[in-house]
Amino acid sequence: MFIIIFASIVLILVGVFFLWHLVLSRAPNPSLKTGQVSIGNNVFTVELATTTIQQARGLSFRTSLTTGTGMLFMFSPGVQNFWMKDMNFPIDMIWIAGDKVAGFAENAQPQPGVPLWKLTIYTSPDGVDKVLEVNANTVTKDNIQIGSPVTIGPGTDF
């Protein structure tokens, strides 16, 4: 009897973990607001990470991003720090100050199995108030440069 109960509990826990993983790995997240960001002639459809929880989670657990999409974070101006915790694919991080690209971290790689305290921290220049995460190599492919103009599309509400 004990074995049956134990096996049942294990199966239930495995099922709960599997469902939890499916929920966290779906993309895009329908509970996030969406908008548009233009950098030069490039237009990105973005999900808006507006709450602390959404910003902490970011793109973690997802398996990919569709080309031309990304996630936009908005902050008070300052130095922003990002990491690749629980990420499954490489990204470019575009640092934005006001309406201009202030810099970027290109081809940031996932670090599976690396303890939190050893994860690489990607640090923006000072004065950054927005960060756009996009697929790796987007900065190079789309010729995004420091000083490129940035426009947050109409209807993109934080």
Where are the predicted features?
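Compact, glycine-rich, soluble single-domain proteins
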Residues: 2, 16-158
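N-terminal Sec-pathway targeting helices
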Residues: 1-12
